[in-house]
C-alpha cells in the first residue's frame, strides 16, 4: 500500500487486523491513505455506494494489538471477494511504522521497507499465540512433546526460523537500526499502549511523582545522563527521581530554587497585569475612534455593522473578532467591551472628552488644509490637485484684524453696550481686496436692513433679538410669518436703497448729462437719471417708443420712483399730473393711490382683478411696440400681474433690477385667502434662487475661476437662506463664512445644530427638515489657524458658542457644555495655563486668566466650579506629561495645596537623587502671561507672578512655594502634616548636598545629625540602631528614596573629616582630635550595623562603601 495511494495491491495471503475495527478484506486494495477510488476503501473516507459488505464475527485479542484500539469489535466490513486485508496505520503489522508487505509507492519507500527484528518477532509470536489459542488442547500437547524430543536429541530451533537472504549492506543497516539513536530518542508510544492495556495511567503516575518535589535535580541534569535518559529527558532509573535527591539538603535546595522561580514568575505576571491596567486606564487610545478617523481621512467607507442579526443567528459560523489583532482593535484584554458599547467620555485624546469627537479639531498651519467636516470638499483644481491658498501673509493679516474686532465685540457684550457688528465686519471686508469681497459687503448691508442696524441713526438691535422668531419650529406660527415678512421687507428696502445710491453716484459722476438743476428733490433726481440714461442710450432698446408729456417720460419717472422705493412720491407725481395721466390712462391714478396707501402694498380684490384684466388685454390686443414698456412694468409691479413671468420685458435692466422685481412681487399672507395664481411668497422665491444657483454658479471650489460664488451667496442671504449660504460659502472662503455666521448668530438668524449630535456635517437638517449649521465646531475648527500663537484670541471665538445657549435655540445646557468642552481642549492643547486660567502673585493671590475674565459670556451658573474643574483636568494633564511647574501653578489655582507640596517634593527628590557632580535637573518654566499686541512677551517686574519668575530649579520652586504657604495660615492648614514634613526634610537634604559639593564636612555632619534619620548619636548602642532602622518604613517615599544618598554623603563626610583630623589641620588638643576620629569611626560602624538591618532595601554598593570605611 502506498502512502499516497494507487500503489500495487498486496498479496492475497496478507491478512492483518485493523486499528479501529476487526480485519477487513478488499477486492481492489488500491485506495490511498487520504481518499478512495471507486473500487477501494480509504482510511478516512467511507466506501462508495457501489461496494457491498458482509459482517463476520471476530475473536477478542488478549494483547490489545491487532484489534480495535477502543475495545473488541464484533463486526467487520468485508467485501465479497477474498483478497488481501487493508494494513493498519498504527499496528505492528503492515503499517507505516512497521514492515509492509506491499511494494513501496512513489516517494514513500522509506516508510514501506523499514522494519526491525523485534517487530518481526512480535508479529510471529502473535501469530503463533493466535494459532495456539485456536488449536485444540491435544495438538498443543503434541507440539510440546515434539519440541522436547528435539531438544533431547540436540536439535536446535534454527530450522524453524526462515532463511535470511540479505547482503552484508542490508544486514549492517538492519543492525544499525536495532540500537538506540543518539540524536533521536526512542518513541515511548508502545510502552504507553502496554501500560494503558494493563490499567496504568502513565500521565497520572508522572504527576503523582512530580508532586513529591524530588525530581528537579534530575530534570536539570537530564542533558548529561546520555543513553540512560528516557525520551522526555528524565532519568529512568528511579521512576523519575534522582538518586541524590533523597537527602534533606538537596530537597531544601530544590525547594528554595522552586520558590524563588515561582516568586519571579508571579512578579513578572503581576507586572504584566499592572502594565496592562496602566495602559487601559491612563493611555486613552480609542482604537475604534482612531480607525474611523483614519477611514474618514482617506475616504474609506467602513463596513456596516448593522448585520448583527446574521451574526447572532449563526454564532458558530463566524468567530468573534473582538479579540483579534485586527487594525484598530486590541488583543490585550478579552474583557474589553465592544467598540459600540464603550463610554463616550473616552473618545478624545485630550483628557477624555465628553463629546463624541474633538470640538476644536486638530491643530494645523494657517492656509489651505483638509476640511474637518465630512460634507465639505477640499479645494482642488480641474486636475484634482490641491489648490494653493492665497498668500498666507494676507490671510494672516486679515485674521488678525478680524480677531481684534471679535475681541472688541466681546468687550462690548460684557459692558452691555451696543455693537454694530455687521457694519464693522463689512468695513474690514471692503478693505480685504478679495474678488468676492463686494458681494460679501453687500450681504452684510442687506442683513443690516433686515435687522434694523442703522449706525447713523444710533439704532442697534439687541443680542439674539430675532432668535425666538427665526427659530420657531412651527412654520405657520405668527412668529415665523412675521420673520418672513421682515426678511422680504429688509431685502426689498436694501435693493431700493442700493439703486438710489447708484442714481446719486451716476448723477454726481456725469453732471452735464444729468443736468439736474433746480430743486434737488427725489423727482428731479429721477428725471436727471432718465436724461442721463437717454444720453448714454441705455434707457430702452432701439426702436422702442416711450410716451411723453410735456417732454417728460412720465411712465419711466413713475417706474424709477417705484424702483427706488419712493411709492408715496410716485403717487404724488401722478396726482400732480392727473390731467395728463387721465388723458392716457384713466384708471392708473386709482391703482397707484390704493397701492401707496396699503401697508402691505396690495390692491383691493376688485381693483386687483380689474388691473390684471387691463394688463392682460393690453398684452394680447395691443400691436407690438405700441405700448410703453415702463407702463406695463408699472402695472406688473402695482397689480402683481402675470406672476409666471417675473421679468421686465422691453427694458434694459441689470441683475439687481431683476432681483428687486422678485422680492417686490413676493408677499407673505394667509395662503388660504389667495388665489392659486397669486401665491408667490418667500418659499417660492427661495426655490427660484436655488434653481438659479444650480444652473449658473459654481458648486465647488474647483469650479470657481472668477469669484462668482460671492454673487450666489449674496442672493441666498437676500432670500433668507442663511444656513445654506454659510454652508455654500465655507468651501470657498471659510474665514468669511465663519464671521458672517457669527453676525447672524448674534442676531438669532442662524439655526444651530444640536450640540449632542454625533454628526460631523457642516449643514444638516433636523426632524422638521429645517436646515441647521454646526456652528460650535465651525468656530472650533477655525481657531486651529492661530490658537497655538494666540490662544487668547481663540478664547474670544470659542465663547461665542454660548450665543446659542438661550431658550430660543433650545438645549442651552448642551450648547454651554459644548463651549466649556472647547475651552477645556484649548487649555490642554495650548498649555498656556498662566494666560488662560490664571497666575499666582508672590503672596499667593491669584491673577484671573482670560477664560475667567470671559466668565459672564460663557453661561456659567457656578463659575468657580467650572474653573476649578478645568483647572484640575489641566493640572493632571500637565503632571502626567512631566510639566512640574505647570502642575504646581494649576493645582495652586485649584486650591489643592496638598498636591502642590507632593509634586514639589517629588521633583525635589529627583533633583537630590542625582549624583554629585552631575548637571542639576532643570524644570520647564511656566509660559509667561504678559504679552503685547504682537504676541511677544513684555518685560515685567521680576517676581510679580509665578509665570514671570521663570523658575526652573526644583529647589527654588520648593522654597518659593513653601515660603508662600508658611506665611499664610489659610494655605498651611490645608496641607497634610506628612507632606509638610517630607518637603521640609527634602529641603534640608538639598542643603546637605550643596554642602557636600562645597567640601564643608563638619557642617554637613551637623545637618545630617539634625535630620535624625541616621543613627549618628547611637555610639554603638544596638537598641538605638534598631529603633532607627524600625523608623525607616515610616519615612515618606520621596525621603526614603534619598536615604542611600544620605548614607553615602555621611560616609564621605566621616572619611574626609577623619583625613583632615589626621592631617594635623585641627588646632586643638591631640587627645581631642583622637576622640573625634574615634567618634567618626564609630559613626561608620553604626551606619554599617544600620544598613545590615535594611539589607534588602539599600543598594549593594552602599554596603561595600561602608565596609571600606569601617576597615579604614
UniProtKB/Swiss-Prot annotation:
One of its GO terms (biological process) is protein import into nucleus. Its main location: nucleus. Residues 1-74, 101-136, 303-350 are annotated as: Disordered. Functions as a component of the nuclear pore complex (NPC). NPC components, collectively referred to as nucleoporins (NUPs), can play the role of both NPC structural components and of docking or interaction partners for transiently associated nuclear transport factors. NIC96, which is localized to the core of the NPC and the distal ring of the nuclear basket, is required for de novo assembly of NPCs. Component of the nuclear pore complex (NPC). NPC constitutes the exclusive means of nucleocytoplasmic transport. NPCs allow the passive diffusion of ions and small molecules and the active, nuclear transport receptor-mediated bidirectional transport of macromolecules such as proteins, RNAs, ribonucleoparticles (RNPs), and ribosomal subunits across the nuclear envelope. Due to its 8-fold rotational symmetry, all subunits are present with 8 copies or multiples thereof. Part of a tetrameric NUP192-NUP170-NIC96-NUP53 or NUP188-NUP170-NIC96-NUP53 module. It is a peripheral membrane protein. Belongs to the nucleoporin interacting component (NIC) family. GO terms for cellular component: nuclear membrane; nuclear pore. GO terms for molecular function: structural constituent of nuclear pore. It is found in: Nucleus, Nuclear pore complex; Nucleus membrane. This is Nucleoporin NIC96. PANTHER family: NUCLEAR PORE COMPLEX PROTEIN NUP93 (PTHR11225:SF4), NUCLEAR PORE COMPLEX PROTEIN NUP93 NUCLEOPORIN NUP93 DEAD EYE PROTEIN (PTHR11225). It comes from the Eukaryota. Residues 39-74, 119-135, 310-319 have a biased composition (Low complexity). Residues 12-29, 101-118 have a biased composition (Polar residues). Residues 113-135, 394-415 form a coiled coil. Keywords: Coiled coil, Membrane, mRNA transport, Nuclear pore complex, Nucleus, Protein transport, Translocation, Transport.
